[in-house]
């Protein structure tokens, strides 16, 4: 949806500290971290590479088509991630902290004063994913089908930023 550019605007224009939940979760899935330890407890050593790191490709294939496995992963990783985000916010000296997370959940409301949703028309999202990540159209559609629908996000959000247009248009909405 073009979230990266929106995050850059908050950081560059408003001096915000940006915390990306996906990066926090990845750090928690490194060797010796509680996320990886928990995943191994749930799924066994078969999810590890020879060097002890998570075999992300194999693990993703294992859980992507298995809703129950994905639910178990989320129930482990999400609370760990939000606890780490809360710690980073407490220790931040920035006046504004922006947390980027793919999903809104109970923890989002507990941690964040406002929830913003960056929305983009589906076809523009597909074009951006194909250009920026090299995905096929089919993979983009599959990813989008597995995400909560736009209506859910817009109802939960305090503010919606339409990022279908230019960077300048998004900037005006942020101000």
Task: Give the ranges of each region predicted by the language model.
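ATP-binding Walker
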Residues: 1
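Walker A/P-loop
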Residues: 4
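Short beta-strand-centered segment that lines the nucleotide-binding/catalytic pocket of NTP-utilizing
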Residues: 16-30
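Residue-level signal for inorganic ion chemistry
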Residues: 22, 73, 98, 105, ...
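ATP-dependent small-molecule kinase phosphotransfer cores
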Residues: 26-93
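ATP-dependent NMP and nucleoside kinases share a basic, alpha-helical "lid"
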Residues: 83-91, 96-132
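Small-molecule kinase domains that catalyze NTP-dependent phosphoryl transfer to phosphate-bearing small molecules
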Residues: 84-85, 93, 110-111, 131, ...
């Amino acid at each position: 949806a073009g979230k990266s550019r929106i995050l850059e605007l908050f950081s560059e224009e408003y001096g915000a500290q940006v915390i990306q939940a996906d990066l926090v979760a990845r750090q928690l899935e490194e060797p010796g971290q509680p996320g990886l330890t928990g995943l191994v407890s749930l799924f066994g050593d078969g999810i590890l590479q020879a060097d002890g790191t998570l075999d992300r490709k194999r693990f993703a294939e294992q859980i992507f088509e298995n809703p129950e496995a994905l639910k178990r992963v989320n129930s482990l990783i999400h609370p760990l991630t939000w606890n780490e985000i809360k710690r980073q916010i407490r220790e931040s000296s920035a006046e504004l902290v922006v947390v980027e997370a793919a999903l809104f959940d109970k923890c989002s409301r507990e941690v964040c004063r406002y929830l913003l949703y960056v929305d983009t028309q589906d076809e523009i999202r597909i074009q951006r994913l194909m250009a920026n990540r090299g995905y096929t159209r089919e993979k983009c559609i599959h990813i989008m089908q597995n995400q909560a629908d736009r209506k859910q996000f817009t109802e939960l959000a305090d503010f919606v930023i339409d990022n279908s247009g230019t960077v300048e248009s998004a900037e005006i909405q942020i101000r």
